[in-house]
Amino acid sequence: MDLLGAHVSIAGGIHNAVDRGVSSGCDVIQIFTQNSNQWKGKAVSPADAQLFRDKLAASGLSHVMSHDIYLINLAAAPGEVKDKSLIAFKEEMQRCAALGIGKIVMHPGSHTGDGEDTGIRRICEAFDQLFGEVPQFTGKVLLENTAGQGTNLGYRFDHLKAIIEGSSYPTRFGVCFDTCHAFASGYPIADRDGYRRTFDEFDRALGIDKLMAFHLNDSKKGLGCKVDRHEHIGAGALGLEPFRFILNDPHFKLVPKFIETPKGDADEMDALNLKLLRSLIEG
């Protein structure tokens, strides 16, 4: 099993994500557990949770990962956005506990002009609160590296390191490495030398064992553009080589890898992008 998959929709019920993943040829899937553009999500009923768990067990999928909603900003100053963010992430943890999902990917957030150190401190404080409030979620939060747009945090590995080391729960974190975001933020992963230097830096900052998931996305824009625009595999500025490097790197053989590339009218592009990625695997 290649541990390749996609972000899939939960339209019509969260259990439908399993069928969509299987239909697209996924080994693993990533989902939103609620509408990603609304603050308030619906609690998962025991019946819905059991249906999801049963379908997942029968599906052959090996990993399911959740992604938090885009509105959440745990780096925000005290106020309405911070309060809503804490509630929304707490509810995300509760839903994942009910569904049996053990990993939540999240964007660290934006300091909105208050400075990187201040934003990182706020994130650490938020997670110290959240892990204490939701003991039933026993999984990990995967911090996703970002493209570096605006005042967003997470575009350097040192940001992720500071969050993990600044938390009272350092063992509850991992990292999700997004290829588009890394390239956009200035990591030169498109050639062999840059790839090696990037992951050597990651290992020095965080330890390679902290890398627990990949988002495999090509980039519409060039190196260091600070713009987050995903493209089909091999059709953007990254090309095919960095994906070939990752898929054949023995360090990452057991790390689940998810595409978040454009879907097409009926999600047909997921199967095509996954087929292309599998063609890059050697041996």
UniProtKB/Swiss-Prot annotation:
The job of this chain, per UniProt, is described as: Endonuclease IV plays a role in DNA repair. It cleaves phosphodiester bonds at apurinic or apyrimidinic (AP) sites, generating a 3'-hydroxyl group and a 5'-terminal sugar phosphate.
- Alphabetical list of HAMAP family matching this protein: Nfo
**Pfam families the UniProt entry points to:** AP_endonuc_2
Q: What cofactor does this protein call for?
A: Zn(2+)
Sequence positions that bind Zn(2+) 2: E144, D178, H215, E260
Entry note: cofactor = Binds 3 Zn(2+) ions.
- The Enzyme Commission number assigned here is 3.1.21.2
Residue positions binding Zn(2+) 3 = H181, D228, H230
- InterPro entries, alphabetized: AP_endonuc_2, AP_endonuc_F2_Zn_BS, Xyl_isomerase-like_sf, Xyl_isomerase-like_TIM-brl
- Which class of enzymes does this protein belong to? hydrolase
Q: Which reaction does it catalyse?
A: Endonucleolytic cleavage to 5'-phosphooligonucleotide end-products
Instruction: List the PROSITE patterns hit by this protein, alphabetically.
Output: AP_NUCLEASE_F2_1, AP_NUCLEASE_F2_2, AP_NUCLEASE_F2_3, AP_NUCLEASE_F2_4
Q: Which domain of life is it from?
A: Bacteria
What parts of the sequence cross the membrane? none
| Single GO molecular function | phosphoric diester hydrolase activity
- Which UniProt keywords are given for this protein, alphabetically ordered? DNA damage, DNA repair, Endonuclease, Hydrolase, Metal-binding, Nuclease, Zinc
Name of the coding gene = nfo
Task: State the protein's name.
Answer: Probable endonuclease 4
Q: Where does Zn(2+) 1 bind?
A: H67, H107, E144
Q: Which family does it belong to?
A: Belongs to the AP endonuclease 2 family.
Provide the GO biological process annotations. Answer: base-excision repair
